[in-house]
Amino acid sequence: SEQAGFRILVGNDMMAAAGKTFEATHPNAKFLLGEIQKFDAKDFLEAAGLKPGELHCLIGGPPCQGFSVYNHNRGLDDDRSQLFHEYMRIVEGIKPAWVVLENVTGILSAGGGAAADAIVESFENLGYRVEKKILKAEEFGVPQERRRVIFMGNRVGAPIVWPDPTHGPAGGRLPPFVTIKDAIGDLPLLENGEDLGAQPYKTPPLSEFQLRMRGNAQYVTNHAAPRLGAINVERLAHIPPGGSWRDI
């Protein structure tokens, strides 16, 4: 978000580990640790030093188990989907100019489309005009295939403009998709269960992505291979190049 020009003010999560990561990457922001049900909009406003209506954008991603394509009893009445209503409670109290909500693609078919319609209606009831769209992470330089539904809207009458893809298939007009090799091809090979600790990079960056991810770092850290049992090692040996567990 900061790379896109935003100044991050406050974050929230119920997991302390997530809070430590947030504080490390956003040292000038405040973090509220705990379940969202324990907080009111005024808690976030006080932490941000703002009044209702002054925040430019509120971003949320309520846990999406209730909307999963694997959940056959899904909809906004699912207990795990109630966190969406908590998110809307905070939106109502903070009154941000813009709102962004992220969820799995299964939300579009949950309840025959009723869940997605209910989300849009909930925003509209608070004065927001909202649109939804599936965005593909690989089209924006992320080295993995990931689809997410983004609900984006505002209450200030501004046009809703979706970003154009920055990456595409090789040979097209856009830079090619970032591959796994582009992302981690400079990391040393490890044996099963091996952890070499911190060590200097053995090669210069081999791709633009690696150059950007390294920054000023001179050492490889947190690079370890989990120890797998013999049966899992055997399974991995039978996955062909470019394949997955489905090919075993």
Each model region followed by its residue ranges:
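Redox-cofactor binding/interface segments in oxidoreductases and associated redox assembly factors
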Residues: 34, 60, 101
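Short SAM/SAH-binding signature in class I
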Residues: 53-61
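Conserved radical SAM core fold
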Residues: 63-67
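Class I S-adenosyl-L-methionine
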Residues: 43-54, 69-248
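Conserved SAM-binding loop of SAM-dependent methyltransferases across substrates and taxa
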Residues: 1-4
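Conserved SAM/SAH-binding beta-strand->alpha-helix loop
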Residues: 15-16
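Short beta-strand element of Class I
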Residues: 8-9
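S-adenosyl-L-methionine
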Residues: 20-50
